[in-house]
């Protein structure tokens, strides 16, 4: 929870917040409607709406601010079991891909400020590609382990360091 809040505060400080948690978001209604409102088929409504709102504000050269307020208190319901958690996380992953695909024209465009130059590229590399890279790394590691190419003393020290500090 601490890393989540610190991450949100960092994104807020640079006005590059990628999303807000569903039940915790407050939006300027007129901007949300002008940007197209909620997209019903979206799997990540909050990220999609924020990205569209930022796109709208930048297209019309209007100032905007996306702020995380860390001391808000609101109750929300989490997944009650592992099956529901799995469905929630796969829906979020599909939503991330969907949002990145829909708004790909914003990526690396100076017009879209932090969202185009930092937030969307970050989301692509560290949220979308990272699990794929990690899976490939695991497969390669298993292959190397079976072929005897792993120095186990070094491998255990690396894993211990990674999982202790990351």
Q: Which residue stretches match the model-derived regions?
A:
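Alpha-helical transmembrane segments of polytopic integral membrane proteins
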Residues: 29, 50, 135-139
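A short, conserved alpha-helix in the catalytic core of glycosyltransferases
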Residues: 31-34, 42-67
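Catalytic core and acceptor-binding pocket of nucleotide-sugar-dependent glycosyltransferases
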Residues: 24, 45-48, 52-53, 121, ...
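Long helical/loop segments within the catalytic core of UDP-sugar-dependent glycosyltransferases
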Residues: 1-42, 55, 90-97, 101
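Charged, alpha-helix-enriched surfaces in structured cytosolic catalytic cores
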Residues: 27, 44, 48, 80-84
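Active-site donor/metal-binding and catalytic loop motifs
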Residues: 64-84
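Basic/Trp-rich segment in TM-proximal cytosolic loops or flexible interdomain/linker regions
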Residues: 14-15, 79-166
């Amino acid at each position: 929870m601490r890393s989540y809040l610190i991450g949100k505060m960092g994104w807020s400080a640079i006005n590059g917040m990628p999303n807000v948690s569903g039940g915790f978001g407050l939006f300027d209604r007129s901007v949300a409607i002008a940007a197209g409102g909620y997209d019903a088929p979206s799997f990540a409504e909050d990220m999609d709406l924020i990205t569209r709102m930022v796109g709208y504000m930048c297209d019309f050269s209007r100032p905007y601010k996306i702020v995380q307020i860390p001391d808000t208190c609101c109750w929300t319901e989490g997944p009650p079991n592992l099956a529901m958690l799995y469905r929630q996380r796969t829906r979020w992953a599909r939503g991330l891909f969907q949002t990145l695909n829909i708004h790909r024209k914003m990526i690396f465009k100076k017009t879209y400020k932090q969202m185009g130059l930092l937030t969307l590229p970050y989301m692509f590399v560290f949220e979308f590609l990272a699990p794929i890279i990690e899976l490939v790394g695991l497969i390669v590691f298993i292959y190397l382990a079976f072929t005897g190419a792993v120095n186990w003393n070094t491998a255990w020290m690396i894993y211990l360091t990674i999982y202790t500090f990351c």
